Amino acid sequence: MHSLKRRRNHAPDWQDFYKNGVPQEVIVIEDSASPRLTPNLPPPFSVHQLQSFVPPQPPSSSSPSTTGTVAVPINGANAVYPSTNSVSLPQSYDPWLDANGVVPLPHDVASHPSYMVQSPTSYHACSNNQSPFPHSHHPPLHNPLPVSCQPVLRPPPVPQVPSHWYPVSLPSPNLPHQPISKPPVIPNLPKLQVHPNRLPHPIHNHPYSSPTSYPPPLCPATYCPSNPPQLAPATAIAPSSQSSQHKSVNYSVTPSSINNHTAVPLSPTLAVWLPMTQPTFQPPSANVYQPASNANQVITPVSISDYRPPKKRKRAAWPPYKKVDRVNVPVVHDTTAFDPSTFDDDDGHYKVVPNSKFANRYTVVRLLGHGTFGKVIQCYDQSTGRHCAIKVTRAIPKYREASLIELRVLQTIAHSDPTNENKCIQLRDYFDYRKHICIVTDLFGWSVFDFLKNNNYIPFPLKHIQMLSQQLFKSVAFLHSLGLVHTDLKPENVLLVSNASRTIRLPYRNYSQKVLNSCEIRLIDFGSATFEDEYHSSVVSTRHYRAPEIILGLGWSYPCDVWSIGCILVELFTGQALFQTHEDSEHLCMMEKILGPFDRNMISRSSRTSQRFFKSDGKVRYPLSNTPKKSINYLQSLQTLEQIFAVSSPEVALLLDLLKKVFVYDPKRRITAKEALWHPFFTQPISSNL
């Protein structure tokens, strides 16, 4: 079965199309650029000159159809009936550039069928005035009609033309040129003259000031030839000579005559026709760009010597980090012939001997500290003449791998912050000596915990808490910007640059107290630091400073460091650790006692082993059957966070508000380290050090 194809065997019934009047609204779709015309293709618009306007006659049986082409604008403008018998069509025309940059090529109009030829119509400013949107102006569209069809048209509306000059694009090179030094001859173009009493708004301030826009609608106006203002030389493209006026046609609806000129298409896509006076124009000078909205303004060409490159964008405070992939540790050979067992103990720790040589460059002074990772010793550098701290890891493969990770972190920090503005420990040297990876750093004073312990666990002054916490938040925010999570923040890993202090005795206290002279700190111990995009172990952080999401098995990220800072601040304020426990259920019960109940949604998302810590009502299942009485009594004696900071002081109230934003169970809703730096607690001046 053959599919039926719709064919147009006869001309469309335009009388039936216009039986309800002219369409009230026109939707115009304009392409970004008109297609290039070729000599083999017909032009999308008419190329013959615009003749005198003749009001259309209503259709009747006594009026035969004309032999010329009929172009009917769908917006109700006048139809044009040029006759080939009275007017000779030109075989070619001067090429023009339209608004889209299309160069129509010369062609033979007579070679095309009569129904393909369109006739331009005059521009009507009140086109599409039947639209329900009074400020929507579109140029009239022209549809070709067969010669035998007589459209039904309304009386012609009041024609208007724009009152300003329309810019014309660059013509083809074969047109006659006029010297730039010679002032252009300005023709008499039709100018819009509106009675001031009937103008809805000042014409010089109306929004339709661009060359492709139109005057306001519904404005009765009168056409009359007038002289436009004189333009500066080489400003706009002007006609080389004036054109002879065509015969004017007197309309009954207009009080004066209308001068019709030749029409030049501005856009073939929209079929917009603008009245012009000459088919030839003078090209502009070289290197002069004339925008459509400012075609009458002189634009000075820019020379190469006047060019100035744009300013470079300022680098951000914390630029995107470049992670160090792997560190190649140089090996320092041992010159002695002793057995390696004489330097290490059974656990792989290095035996520290004061006044002994170390790595052929350093002299051991004393032991500073030790831990599961290894030992920290104070040495004298014979090359620089300064004391330094050397972290000597255990000669066990897993600790060696951990030290390589720490070296990667320290090198990443050093590359991102060479001036050490963010108070992190700086890497000075590293090497492999006797199967121990050694990390050399500057020598600092006590840790915050050591100073607190040496001060009989007396709380720090509020002013010092403000200074210490601000530096700590800044260091952690810097690490987070590098994609690093410290995971082991505690007072032991916060070093004082100098532990110099003074002892004071307050009259209302029975004991003396040490007060630091300087609160400058350095953040240390990056052995557990983890890049955000790398493997995360299930359990991190020291027990007292561990975040709840780690205990519940929900995974961890940057917020776990913020929780640890909150625990440090409470310890600086009270002198005691906030969560003194070593068991998960007791730890969760302490959080519930001090900070409030857990979120039911967070409990449901926790691991199956962690859900056994809670009852069906969402409370922590504690005490257990094997819980000692001492632990139960201690937990019952705990105070809430508001009771701990129940001091009538605005500074303490601000610190409490900051801690409430830190101790949020949901890590997504917890304040970040960068946001904490903007908290009012750090901008509040605290006068007294005590």
Swiss-Prot record:
Catalytic residue list: D488
Domain annotation Protein kinase: ranges: 362-682
Residues binding ATP, per UniProt: L368, G369, H370, G371, T372, F373, G374, K375, V376, K391
PROSITE patterns given in the database record: PROTEIN_KINASE_ATP, PROTEIN_KINASE_DOM, PROTEIN_KINASE_ST
Protein family: Belongs to the protein kinase superfamily. CMGC Ser/Thr protein kinase family. Lammer subfamily.
Post-translational modification: Autophosphorylates on all three types of residues.
E.C. code: 2.7.12.1
Catalytic reactions of this protein: L-seryl-[protein] + ATP = O-phospho-L-seryl-[protein] + ADP + H(+); L-threonyl-[protein] + ATP = O-phospho-L-threonyl-[protein] + ADP + H(+); L-tyrosyl-[protein] + ATP = O-phospho-L-tyrosyl-[protein] + ADP + H(+)
GO BP of this protein: cellular response to oxidative stress; negative regulation of G1/S transition of mitotic cell cycle; negative regulation of transcription by RNA polymerase II; positive regulation of mRNA splicing, via spliceosome; regulation of RNA splicing; septum digestion after cytokinesis; signaling
Region feature (Disordered): 39-70
Pfam families: Pkinase
Keywords: ATP-binding, Kinase, Nucleotide-binding, Phosphoprotein, Serine/threonine-protein kinase, Transferase, Tyrosine-protein kinase
Protein name per its UniProtKB record: Dual specificity protein kinase lkh1
CDD domains: PKc_CLK (cd14134)
Organism of origin: Schizosaccharomyces pombe (strain 972 / ATCC 24843)
